[in-house]
Amino acid sequence: SSMYCILVTGVPAAGKSIMAEAVAERLKLPVISKDRIKELLFDSVGFRSRKEKVNLGIAAMEIMYYAAAQLMRAGLPFILENNFEYSSRSGMQALLDEYNYAALTLTLTGDYRAIYQRFLERESSPDRHRGHVVNDCYPEREERGTEERRNPHGETKAAGISYEDFVQGIERRGFDAFSVGGRQIKIDTTDFSKIDA
């Protein structure tokens, strides 16, 4: 099939969005990012509990698939950026089958220790969207409107996840083992400066 899409996936903080943007720039393709959709939902809808946050994540996934299906209907190539996991396989496979699309999967992985360090730095970075970091309430009510809430040292800092839990989550959910058949390229992003996009 000449119709194809590129799936950029892999472990948390492996650099999926940077990679997706680089490939998009080079191939002049649109990128649909589940995290970006999630951020739009965080800002426009918000959440007041962990459950509501999870529901926005599910909604973001549905919107991502909807957009992908529209591009497939038009026979256009595109990039999907998402932390695909074992449980996403059937939904993605069904789309590929329905529209007779081939997928090239770029799986970003590397030394878990180094990537875990990057994960911790990202979670406490002022540039990280707060909706990803907090679990109870976003926008954060008490400090709304002040610069205070962007303070990475505030008490709403990410509940620290241990290295063991980080690795266990990757293995249990299959972040670096996801596959829908087709061509798959594993990219080691332990050291970003060594990657030749």
Please provide the spans of the model-predicted regions.
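Small-molecule kinase domains that catalyze NTP-dependent phosphoryl transfer to phosphate-bearing small molecules
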Residues: S125-I195
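Conserved phosphate-donor/acceptor-positioning beta-strand/loop module used by diverse small-molecule
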Residues: Y99-E121, I187
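Hydrophobic anchor at the beta1->P-loop junction of P-loop NTPases
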Residues: V8
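Walker A (P-loop) ATP-phosphate-binding motif of ABC ATPase nucleotide-binding domains
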Residues: C5
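Glycine-rich phosphate-binding loop used to anchor ATP phosphates in small-molecule kinases
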Residues: L56-A103
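Conserved substrate/cofactor phosphate-moiety recognition/catalytic segment
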Residues: S17-R73
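The conserved Walker
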Residues: P12
